[in-house]
Amino acid sequence: MSTSHESHHAPVDGAGGPSTTGHEWDGIQELNNPLPRWWLWTFYATIIWAFGYWVAYPAWPLVSNYTSGVLGWNSRSAVVEQISDLQKLRAASSAKLANVPLEDIEKNPELLSLARAEGKVAFADNCAPCHGAGGGGAKGFPNLNDDDWLWGGTLAQIQQTITHGIRSGDDEGHQGNMLAFGSILSKADISNVADYVRSLSGAAPGDTPAAKKGAEIFAANCATCHGENGKGNQELGSKNLTDGIWLYGGDKATIVQTITNGRGGVMPAWGPRLSPTTIKALTVYVHTLGGGQ
């Protein structure tokens, strides 16, 4: 036994070479190469550090709580503290905006810069998911960079829309919606109206028999909201059909779908969620994106 044991642990690389661990399988032996000493000390240090972390910081979950650590620190309290510090920094600039009438902010370069900076942050946090980071919009969400406004693009009108929303449940919010004509008009009539509507913006010829029939149906059913010339009515939120700017799409299939099923997009009322000063900054920011009236 002694001879066998010694033979299994004999150096395989000659004198001074690594020995085997004593195991062999199908002629394969495992060399006994110890880990470098620096690696072992590093490993031991990480174990000691881990124990220290468990003691100092929140680490272990309990039944209804967790170990808080001797330092009493946690990331949530740190975030609350950072938010509080940020609010203190913003308080001075917010106070300046709060004490100036909305229509005077853009006349003062310093206030305009403050409003745009605060409005940009608020827009990114609250508005960008729907309207896009740069306000370019998407299908069903208005582009805020152009001059096509359903409910008006003046400072006062934008502030009203942001504060009270559209079909948001707020009593002071905008309430207009596009009716569904699928049960009122025949498919042929809806197709003719779609041809006429597209002709208003030059997307289709207006002298075809279908467009001419559509014009008559439009006058009887659509002109009340969109106007006889199709230029819309901002008091009702009725779209201008002559500018070629489409919220849901200007191809015939989409227009037929809109006429058939109607539209009723919703925008939240931000008045209960944001401070008046933040809404004022948002109003200025949106107004200066490029399409403000």
From Swiss-Prot:
GO cellular component, one term: plasma membrane
Record-annotated membrane-spanning stretches: 43-63
Domain of life: Bacteria
Domain Cytochrome c: 114-201, 209-290
Statement: the UniProt record of this protein carries the keyword Ribonucleoprotein: no
Cofactor note: Binds 2 heme C groups per subunit.
MF term (GO), any: electron transfer activity
Record InterPro entries: CcoP_N (IPR032858), CcoP_N_sf (IPR038414), Cyt_c-like_dom (IPR009056), Cyt_c-like_dom_sf (IPR036909), Cyt_C_IC (IPR008168), Cyt_c_oxidase_cbb3_su3 (IPR004678), Cytochrome_c_Oxidase_Subunit (IPR050597)
Membrane topology of this protein: Single-pass membrane protein
GO biological process, one term: oxidative phosphorylation
Positions in coiled-coil regions: none
Alphabetized UniProt keyword annotations: Cell inner membrane, Cell membrane, Electron transport, Heme, Hydrogen ion transport, Ion transport, Iron, Membrane, Metal-binding, Oxidoreductase, Repeat, Respiratory chain, Transmembrane, Transmembrane helix, Transport
Necessary cofactors: heme c
UniProt pathway: Energy metabolism; oxidative phosphorylation
Protein name per the record: Cbb3-type cytochrome c oxidase subunit FixP
